[in-house]
């Protein structure tokens, strides 16, 4: 699996070098982005589906890492992962941030730190030489509390902060919480989407990007 992701990353870099007309998209996120639980992550994750929907004018990098938090002092910060570093190497034109689900765990959740670190991530990505356009995703619903992950914190904590920062930084919001609210049957463990739900997520994101 690791080799397949490395080859995909390498092929995307080669594609970038071959054509300046291809818009590069980096999908930043946790296990929902990486494709946890899907039969073949490297072929059915939402970034792969997004790449298929958008077509040859776009090249999409899956930069998701399972179990990660946006908060720097969470139990597994995205900041320390190679996937975070890969975003800078890739020099994307567009970055899609979908982080927050694991931050809702009681041992992780600190509203002030989440807001502070989310702003820091936005500011850090803005330093990339390609000057990427940043989209922020409202997390998909948590249909049943599990591992401490809960929808109450998503609704009352995560979403208001993301909306506040989007307004402050003039960023586009992709509402996956509302968009996937009726799809509980397609979240196999109440948190992670199956192949059908992944395709729906990709379609929602593609529609938002295509309108620009």
Regions picked out by a protein language model, each given a short descriptive name:
Residues 1-3, 10-23:
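Bacterial Sec-dependent signal peptides at the C-terminal "C-region" and cleavage site
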Residues 59-61, 133, 170-172:
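Conserved beta-strand segments of alpha/beta enzyme cores
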